[in-house]
Regions:
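Surface-exposed, charge/polar-rich loops and edge strands
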Residues: 2-181
Length: 181
């Protein structure tokens, strides 16, 4: 059995509203077990019914949820080990964290970007923001709150592909609560 976290993009934004109970029921109807949700922002912890690849579980979830909800549901899946690694990774120094009024963010990507895409993304970072790539994530320390950032999300998506964003604190809480991290 494969235990994983699925980070769903665009949940509970605009008109795309779903309760955690309904989301859990849809995921269980797709054959996943031990389903738990964390906050109302599309964080689902689950066990896949077989030991297939993580990508297979993500694809099955994305297809099934998109059909059930009648809108596209991009899924960014990570194994328990990957979630613990994201939570433990500390890309920013104490001084950098203290100098920022923004919260550390983790952008989950479908795949690790190639060198040219990384360079393009780094060039898009607003002044005083910090970007650090690690595996299939872009760790971001905005110098201001997200509502004030000058980051061009569309240009960033063009450079590195679509992503979903969670605070580092959310990743840490999921790791601690669901994966013994």
């Amino acid at each position: 059995m494969l235990r994983l976290a699925a980070f769903l993009r665009g949940m509970n934004l605009g008109r795309r509203r779903i309760t955690n109970d309904d989301l859990r029921a849809h995921v269980e109807a797709l054959g996943f077990t031990d389903v738990a949700t964390f906050r109302a922002s599309g964080n689902v912890i689950l066990t896949a019914p077989d030991d297939g690849a993580l990508e297979d579980a993500a694809r099955r979830l994305a297809t099934g949820l998109s059909e059930a909800l009648a809108y596209d549901v991009p899924v960014f899946a990570r194994s328990a080990e990957q979630v613990r690694a994201m939570a433990a990774f500390e890309p920013f120094s104490a001084d950098e964290l203290a100098a920022s009024t923004g919260k550390p963010q983790v952008m989950l990507l479908v795949q690790a970007p190639k060198a040219a895409a990384r360079r393009a993304a780094l060039a898009l970072a607003p002044a005083d923001d910090l970007f650090v790539f690690e595996a299939k994530e872009l760790h971001w320390l905005p110098s201001v709150g997200l509502s004030q950032t000058e980051l061009d999300y569309k240009a960033l998506a063009k450079a590195i592909g679509h992503a979903t964003v969670r605070t580092k604190g959310t990743i840490e809480l999921i790791a601690a609560k669901h994966f013994g991290g």
